[in-house]
Regions:
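Multi-pass alpha-helical transmembrane bundles in non-GPCR membrane proteins
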Residues: 2-220
Length: 220
């Protein structure tokens, strides 16, 4: 039986009255033991990606990378790790909604392995706006669930704030990559070095805040 958000909002949640939640990872917000199991899974993901990050950082240090560039590489990897966590929770929630009897953890593990085996290199993290994609993905798939779960306006307000952060992140990314499209002066390569440095930092700031906002919304 599919989850009925209206009935849930009217009657509140109790395991006996809503047995369809029993096989879904979506009940992790109500059952600490399942939340703990998911935490362990996420810790394993962070450990996997952290090893990759340290390996890349050591390579850059050995090649004499400047400290500011090393900072941006670190931020890139933090974005990728956060993206994996968001996609893991999001895919698990979607699987629990569509096929309640399916072990959504299997899909989550496949998502982690699929992303990890692609290398998660600097090229991936800089060319693919992972945080923005994850924020849009999560906002779309989780909005009804989050808003109806608590039956208050906080979920809606948080979604609005996250959406604004996503828009700001997208604008900063456009400013960093395509300054000419916004009427700014560019060199022969189509770049504006002065604008690109701080616009890139703003992109990381806004996209990271959007992801963290949504992560707090999902787990509250």
């Amino acid at each position: 039986m599919l989850w009925n958000p209206t009935r849930f909002c009217e009657n509140g949640y109790t395991p006996n009255r809503h047995p369809e939640w029993a096989s879904a990872l979506s009940m992790l917000v109500f059952y600490p033991c399942i939340a703990r199991a998911l935490q362990l899974q996420l810790y394993a993901t962070v450990a996997l990606l952290g090893t990759n990050m340290l390996s890349s950082m050591s390579t850059h240090l050995s090649q004499g990378m400047a400290a500011d560039n090393l900072f941006f590489v670190t931020v890139d990897y933090i974005d990728v790790v956060t993206t994996v966590l968001i996609l893991t929770v999001g895919l698990a929630e979607i699987a629990a909604r569509i096929v309640p009897w399916l072990n959504a953890g299997i899909i989550a593990v496949l998502a982690i392995v699929g992303l990890a085996t692609q290398g998660l290199s600097d090229e991936l993290s800089t060319q693919w706006s992972g945080s923005v994609v994850a924020a849009l993905f999560t906002t779309t798939t989780m909005s009804v669930y989050v808003v109806c779960r608590r039956c208050d306006g906080r979920g809606t307000l948080t979604l609005v704030v996250a959406g604004m952060l996503v828009v700001l992140a997208a604008c900063a990314k456009l400013l960093a990559d395509e300054p000419g499209a916004l009427g700014l002066p560019v060199d022969e390569h189509g770049c504006n070095a002065h604008t690109a440095s701080w616009a890139h930092a703003l992109w990381h700031l806004f996209s990271g805040l959007a992801v963290l906002t949504l992560l707090g919304l999902i787990t509250r």
